[in-house]
């Protein structure tokens, strides 16, 4: 998917020195790139028995919601703590300098739901692992994690596969971090 990869800009030294930030806003601004991205996911996941798509705040919403619409299934927003109004279930995870918490509504998942988990990118995998654990608490089966970008040098997709047996599909990869 070199077309999609070519539409993603790299911002050096953001958010801190030494980081190469992979910015998907340039992809989102490009109608051809956006259509190709969503179309790639639709082609991969249609007719797979997916019952819901879950997206991780905030950029996972950008592919997850339109994909759920195209697949004819519901969308589950996975939010940061305190952002959902009804009863929630939460999962804590480690950050580079501390901890964070993500939540979903308790009634968002039915036991046996076959969930596709979406985000824009997987790096170290911390947020994605927490999201998988959160969905599994409510009885979901995770079909796969779909991302636009994998940063394989940071090991997140490998951890997700090895620790939780959840495969990761990425449209493109970038070396480094």
Curated annotation (Swiss-Prot):
InterPro entries: Ade_phspho_trans (IPR005764), Adenine_PRTase (IPR050120), PRibTrfase_dom (IPR000836), PRTase-like (IPR029057). It is an enzyme of class 2 (transferase). PROSITE patterns: PUR_PYR_PR_TRANSFER. It comes from the Bacteria. Its main location: cytoplasm. It is found in: Cytoplasm. Pathway: Purine metabolism; AMP biosynthesis via salvage pathway; AMP from adenine: step 1/1. Keywords: Cytoplasm, Glycosyltransferase, Purine salvage, Transferase. One of its GO terms (biological process) is adenine salvage. Its EC number is 2.4.2.7. One of its GO terms (cellular component) is cytoplasm. CDD domains: PRTases_typeI. It catalyses: AMP + diphosphate = 5-phospho-alpha-D-ribose 1-diphosphate + adenine. One of its GO terms (molecular function) is adenine phosphoribosyltransferase activity. The keyword Phosphoprotein does not apply. Catalyzes a salvage reaction resulting in the formation of AMP, that is energically less costly than de novo synthesis. HAMAP family: Aden_phosphoribosyltr (MF_00004). PANTHER family: ADENINE PHOSPHORIBOSYLTRANSFERASE, PHOSPHORIBOSYLTRANSFERASE DOMAIN-CONTAINING PROTEIN. Belongs to the purine/pyrimidine phosphoribosyltransferase family. Homodimer. This is Adenine phosphoribosyltransferase. The gene is apt.
